[in-house]
Amino acid sequence: MIYSKEIVREWLDEVAERAKDHPEWVDVFERCYTDTLDNTVEILEDGSTFVLTGDIPAMWLRDSTAQLRPYLHVAKRDALLRQTIAGLVKRQMTLVLKDPYANSFNIEENWKGHHETDHTDLNGWIWERKYEVDSLCYPLQLAYLLWKETGETSQFDEIFVVATKEILHLWTVEQDHKNSPYRFVRDTDRKEDTLVNDGFGPDFAVTGMTWSAFRPSDDCCQYSYLIPSNMFAVVVLGYVQEIFAALNLADSQSVIADAKRLQDEIQEGIENYAYITNSKGEKIYAFEVDGLGNASIMDDPNVPSLLAAPYLGYCSVDDEVYQATRRTILSSENPYFYQGEYASGLGSSHTFYRYIWPIALSIQGLTTRDKAEKKFLLDQLVACDGGTGVMHESFHVDDPTLYSREWFSWANMMFCELVLDYLDIR
């Protein structure tokens, strides 16, 4: 059993009662909330949990965490659901040990995915091997939040310890990518799907930050130090120190020391290289930098993003640099900010021109203190569902019936998270 239907039903009724003035939200919320549990989650023979991303038959380390995070509230009551989430952490960490550079995996060693087009060190477990810093942040985040929200500790097993060490090692290696074994070339006409310089990536200088090949959108980085992902790494490295200290896990002293060193060096790199100025002369965060003086002003509509920095726990919503960055991102200075007849928000090179992402709209709502803005965004999300009653990867700002991805569970669950936030269920 994945969860207790009675407990979840009772909780859904409580949410519906609290949101009774917004029945249109409740309708979409219930559909999205139950769909992920009923149609994407599978308990495997070893007791671990596999979470399908939706209409692609694979599990992303990033997406799967975000898909189950909104269930932490009810997992306090539901022991079955707690074990399902703990099982996901176990599956994620097992897969990290299959290959820490991969972003998405198969349910078994079946060699499905991009094996015919991708030139990189593949194995049968890997759906895609695009290295993204955040892919390694998310399992650590879920393990920590599950512990803090519910008290569950079964996820902190030997595999967790070994995988955490592997993550720390990889991030250390990638502080100077010249020492890295990772290369990635795809046979494609789409430049965003492959790395330049024979798979090595663009030029860079050492900064203290950790290198990333691809963004959370699965498009390649223009410059190799992705600031939002390094912010996320700083946060989860703090989680690692807290977990190993509080629970006295194996090799805790050395793991804590390594995590602290990495955290300090990455944070120093952010402070030394991430700050730039916008067109108004305000100090803001760059999206990507290369350590050679180049930087980009934009944002990714996925998470981690600059917009999501407070959501990730990196800074306060009220931080002056964050607020200036937020204003810049949500303006025409960001080349991927689109305004249209039905909506405005963040798009991506990963999707069509003038298509914006519901995930980014949800994050916009989750990173404001303005209740009216949250309500506006929830109303907009429901109105722009293309008549389907669920969220999508992206939709056209002038015609929401034009959208990408019929079934995208991550977007569904980010909508649910914003509803819960609006109702002060945090």
Residue positions per predicted region:
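Extended ligand-binding clefts on enzyme/binding-domain cores
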Residues: 61, 97-104, 108, 120, ...
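Active-site-adjacent bridging/hinge elements
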Residues: 36-46, 110-119, 203-215, 336, ...
